[in-house]
């Protein structure tokens, strides 16, 4: 059964992907930690569409989680022809004062889980000469971000990794794309306990997913969501990297000193 696997699917961008793709007739396998939210979303999709919505409650911060998830798809006889690596989180603050264990957990989820899941599901897609992988990066991946040092670095990895795989796989029928949202109305700021930016700069998860699906139809390797975000990422190419870093640091420093 052809199925889209979405990680971080219980809310935000992941849930928006689930709703948009279900409306297009795609079966979905939703993965997140919160079983209650996954059940509610599967029930919602079942009421509103004719697709089959399934879930796996799993913490991808655990090193063996990707293997467990892959084995579960085989047990259910699901053919994953679209993988959306959306699960991730960020931290903010002076790196020297942050919990080192939490920073390493972020690397596990934002990087290792993405690489592990991609490597497990990609071979079957190539064998079938069709498939799609969307890795959710961030506009933070285009430059260093003081006081978000680890988070920005993980998203830079996802961006570079995805661009490389786009070229490696484009002649094998598999399309790999990096989605780079800017500030999005999810639970990120509540969890990080920081001030939200002005609402005019914030997109909804639905807006981000609509942009992603348009970019996917055009076979783009990188999609930046939002005109302002795209303009900023392009402008940074013409400014010294050290200046971009200092400007970002100046904007965030007062919150943490």
Language model: regions and residue ranges:
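Conserved NAD(P)H cofactor-binding loop of Rossmann-fold oxidoreductase domains
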Residues: 86-91
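Active-site helix of classical SDR
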Residues: 118, 154
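Conserved glycine-rich Rossmann-like NAD(P)H-binding loop of the short-chain dehydrogenase/reductase
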Residues: 24-41
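Residue(s) in the substrate-gating loop at a strand-loop-helix junction
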Residues: 138
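Substrate-binding pocket helix/loop in short-chain dehydrogenase/reductase
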Residues: 94-96, 102-107
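Conserved glycine-rich cofactor-binding loop
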Residues: 10-11
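SDR active-site lid
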Residues: 166-231, 242
């Amino acid at each position: 059964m052809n199925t889209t696997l979405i990680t971080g699917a219980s809310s935000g961008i992941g849930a928006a992907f689930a709703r948009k793709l279900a409306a297009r007739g795609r079966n979905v396998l939703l993965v997140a930690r919160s079983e209650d939210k996954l059940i509610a979303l599967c029930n919602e999709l079942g009421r509103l569409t004719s697709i089959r919505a399934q879930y796996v409650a799993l913490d991808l911060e655990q090193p063996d989680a990707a293997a467990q998830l892959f084995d579960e798809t085989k047990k259910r006889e699901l053919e994953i022809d679209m993988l959306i690596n959306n699960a991730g989180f960020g931290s903010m603050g002076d790196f020297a004062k942050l919990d080192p264990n939490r920073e390493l957990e972020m690397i596990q989820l934002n990087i290792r889980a993405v690489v592990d899941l991609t490597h497990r599901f990609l071979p079957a897609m190539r064998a079938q000469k069709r498939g799609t992988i969307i890795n959710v990066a961030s506009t933070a991946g285009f430059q260093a971000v003081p006081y978000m040092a680890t988070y920005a670095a993980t998203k830079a990895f996802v961006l570079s990794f995805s661009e490389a795989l786009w070229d490696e796989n484009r002649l094998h029928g598999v399309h790999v794309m990096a989605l780079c949202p800017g500030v999005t109305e999810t639970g990120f700021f509540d969890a990080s306990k920081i001030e939200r930016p002005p609402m005019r700069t914030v997109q909804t998860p639905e807006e981000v997913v609509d942009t992603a699906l348009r970019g996917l139809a055009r076979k783009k390797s990188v999609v930046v969501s939002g005109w302002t975000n795209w303009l900023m990422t392009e402008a940074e190419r013409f400014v010294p990297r050290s200046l971009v870093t200092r400007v970002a640091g100046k904007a965030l420093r007062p919150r943490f000193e």
